[in-house]
Amino acid sequence: DLCVSAVISTSKSKEFVMKVGVNLINFGPGASPDSIKRWAQLTESLGYHLLMTSDHIGIKPDVQGRYPAPFYEPVSTLAWLAGITTTIEIGTTVLIVPYRSALEIAKAFANIDQFSGGRVILGVGIGWAQEEFAGLGVEYKRRGAITNEYLEAIKLLWTQDLASYEGRYVSFK
């Protein structure tokens, strides 16, 4: 089963553009490198605009029914998809920002953007699974503030040759 999603964006001319894509199933009994590759290439050959992956790092037993094993990590999956597709945009439906460092996210997505010829999309969110946050040692109640700060830092890293940032959750020079 595939979940079709749509993204609406505006250009500088204020025209609306709808892009239709597929949320690639990167988890569960049907997920395997072979099936992911087949779905990616089929989706691209059918002319879809987007191929998106889901994110979870540590699946706890209480939600394992929703996200059964295996669960392929989305960032490394996107790097692989960049090499086996040529035109379709690739990205995350929601990358749970507080699960990774701001520097790691910025570097990984900058690399994938280069590998893919500018086809990567970073979809982000704050997350909802309290047990997953606990397992990763991230404070659940601060996930919104962490996400906001990380996104500020990531933007600086992507737009400045020599970036520096001093915040509560991330600092670099």
What are these regions (language model features)?
Residues 25-27, 56, 95-97, 125-129:
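Active-site beta-loop-alpha junctions enriched in small/polar residues
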Residues 15, 61-65, 98-173:
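Internal, glycine-rich beta/alpha segment that forms the wall or movable "lid"
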Residues 1-3, 7-13:
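Short, low-complexity, charge-dense intrinsically disordered segments
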Residues 44-45, 79-86, 109, 113-119:
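Acidic (Asp/Glu)-rich catalytic clusters
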Residues 20-22, 51-53, 90-92, 120-124:
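Hydrophobic faces of well-ordered beta-strands that scaffold small-molecule active sites
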Residues 14-84:
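N-terminal beta1-alpha1-beta2 module of alpha/beta enzyme domains
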Residues 46, 84-88, 153, 157-161:
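A structural motif corresponding to the C-terminal end of an alpha-helix
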Residues 79-83, 89-98:
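Structural motif corresponding to the early beta-alpha repeats
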